[in-house]
C-alpha cells in the first residue's frame, strides 16, 4: 500500500551554514635593502711642529762713535811730542829691566 501524502514531503533542504574561518596568513616577505652609510668621523689632531731652521748671519757692525774733542785736540797739538816721550819711557823701562835681571 502506498503511504499517504500526509507524511511524504517534497520540501527543499535548509540552506547550508556559514563558511569556516580563513586559514593563517603566509610568511612575511624578504627584508628591504640596507640604508646608506653614515657620515665620516672628525679629523684627527695635527702632528707636532718640525725643528726650527738655523740662524741667519749677523748684521754688519754699526758706525764708530765720534772722537773725544779733548783727545783729538791734544793729539793734534802734542802728537809728535807724545810719541817721543812714549819712546823714551819704553827705552828707559827696558834698560831698567835688563839691568835688574843681569846685574
Curated annotation (Swiss-Prot):
Record field: compositional bias (Polar residues): 1-11
Sequence ranges of Gly residues compositional bias: 14-65
Domain of life of the native organism: Viruses
Region (Disordered): 1-70
Protein name: Uncharacterized 9.5 kDa protein in DHFR 3'region
Organism: Saimiriine herpesvirus 2 (strain 488) (SaHV-2)
Amino acid at each position: 500500500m502506498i503511504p499517504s501524502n500526509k507524511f511524504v514531503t517534497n520540501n527543499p533542504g535548509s540552506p547550508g551554514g556559514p563558511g569556516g574561518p580563513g586559514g593563517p596568513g603566509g610568511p612575511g616577505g624578504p627584508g628591504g635593502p640596507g640604508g646608506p652609510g653614515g657620515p665620516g668621523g672628525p679629523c684627527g689632531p695635527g702632528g707636532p711642529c718640525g725643528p726650527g731652521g738655523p740662524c741667519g748671519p749677523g748684521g754688519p757692525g754699526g758706525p764708530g762713535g765720534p772722537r773725544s774733542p779733548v783727545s783729538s785736540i791734544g793729539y793734534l797739538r802734542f802728537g809728535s811730542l807724545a810719541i817721543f816721550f812714549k819712546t823714551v819711557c819704553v827705552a828707559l823701562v827696558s834698560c831698567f829691566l835688563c839691568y835688574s835681571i843681569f846685574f
